[in-house]
Amino acid sequence: MALNLRKNHPLLKTINDALIDLPTPSNISTWWNFGSLLGICLVTQIVTGLLLAMHYTADTSLAFNSVAHMCRNVQFGWLIRNLHANGASFFFICIYLHIGRGIYYGSYLNKETWNIGVILLLTLMATAFVGYVLPWGQMSFWGATVITNLFSAIPYIGQTLVEWAWGGFSVDNPTLTRFFALHFLLPFVIAGLTLVHLTFLHETGSNNPLGIPADCDKIPFHPYYSTKDILGFALMLILLISLALFSPNMLGDPENFTPANPLATPPHIKPEWYFLFAYAILRSIPNKLGGVLALAASVLVLFLFPLLHKSKQRSMTFRPLSQILFWTLVANLLVLTWVGSQPVEHPFIIIGQLASISYFTIILVLFPLAAVLENKMLKL
């Protein structure tokens, strides 16, 4: 009998077990597409980023002009830059939907996969933040100043830590060069963590919309889900290319068309849209350390989901109370995102504070309470 190379070759069999013969639940919906879409985002960002890095100069006197030169004089430089800038937005859209899916269907009960996923989110946020500083526009500079300054709220070592991160007494050339180094490095860290994430996922297999074991009814990944993934790729890439070609600056900040000036502060300092929810939570507490702790908690709270799961059912598919809370949480995050983009004045201050309180209340109090109540109602 001929040797089946796909199943016996040391390297090919790993790929085969992950992408071809992987046993997959037969009923996973389009919400399960976002993992592979994140993979495509990562590859796109690394490729476009590498091409941009070939023309970028990490120096305060040259950075802004090097980006302008790229868009004007490099073949398709404008397109590569627009794809990279908007690709970051799609990366976050996909990861937020992916996390939302995980919460709704109880995927967080695969604890190792979930924890690596949260670490991936934190790494992605760090990568996006340091990358945003590189074009050295006004909002790049002041965003870097404001966010790095938050570390000075850490008692005793805070100020030393910030000056160590800056490489001086303010955001300047050393800061820019180290941010470029980090922005180059971190995507490869993300790629490595992704492999760990998949390794843990393939230990248990995928969850499914019913939240029940599906071992009795598995189908091979290829051709079924490989085809389904390609459809997802096409749809996302159409949206990304449309955004990059028709309105590339829609999600950016107009302040970044002005070179960084340490002597002029923009009227409203705000991060990119994908950080606005966390920024709103940070601003809702009128104390520096308290705000920083709330900011950290807004993302780190994801680590607690496996511990807060009190329901006898895994997924929310048949749990209407939890569903109502889930969609309230989604609406709440949209409100936080909107408030984060508004100036610090009445009524936005109180709206932000109420939305921040309800964010933590829903996750830490109401989700477990609803689960216990549903167990009682169903006599489980």
Swiss-Prot record:
Per UniProt, heme b b562 binds at H84, H183
Q: Highest taxon of the source?
A: Eukaryota
Spans through the membrane? 34-54, 78-99, 114-134, 179-199, 227-247, 289-309, 321-341, 348-368
Question: Its topology with respect to the membrane?
Answer: Multi-pass membrane protein
Provide the residue positions that the database annotates as binding heme b b566: H98, H197
Gene Ontology cellular component terms for the protein in this record: mitochondrial inner membrane; respiratory chain complex III
Name the coenzymes or cofactors required: heme b
Could you provide one GO biological process annotation from this protein's UniProt record?
A: mitochondrial electron transport, ubiquinol to cytochrome c
Q: Which InterPro entries match?
A: Cyt_b/b6_C, Cyt_b/b6_C_sf, Cyt_b/b6_N, Cytb/b6-like_sf, Cytochrome_b, Cytochrome_b_C_euk/bac, Cytochrome_b_N_euk/bac, Di-haem_cyt_TM
Database matches in PANTHER family: CYTOCHROME B
Q: What is this protein called?
A: Cytochrome b
Identify the gene encoding this protein: MT-CYB
